């Protein structure tokens, strides 16, 4: 389960890398790459949540950050629903901050199921 949390963190790290190096990677389809990283992020976070709380989705979704993670996974990542409303971000940094808050909340909610020594140290990294 820790692997999925670390993979979700690496998705954020990759978006940080894109933001910091946008002038060097501008010839790539960045919109598609960022969307792919976000999709993987939400799927990985939900794997951690589902494995940590297999029968308590309704209860943990009382937390608005957790509810937003499931919303993205269920309405946009697993399949695109007609009623899906995407979050609008003016800058990649806004998206990064939102995702950081979300993964930190996943760590809090799932702390009893994860190793004690796991940390979320974000670094600019292209995987």
Please place each PLM-identified region on the residue numbering:
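Amphipathic alpha-helical interface segments
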Residues: 1-68, 83-127
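Long, charged low-complexity segments
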Residues: 71-78
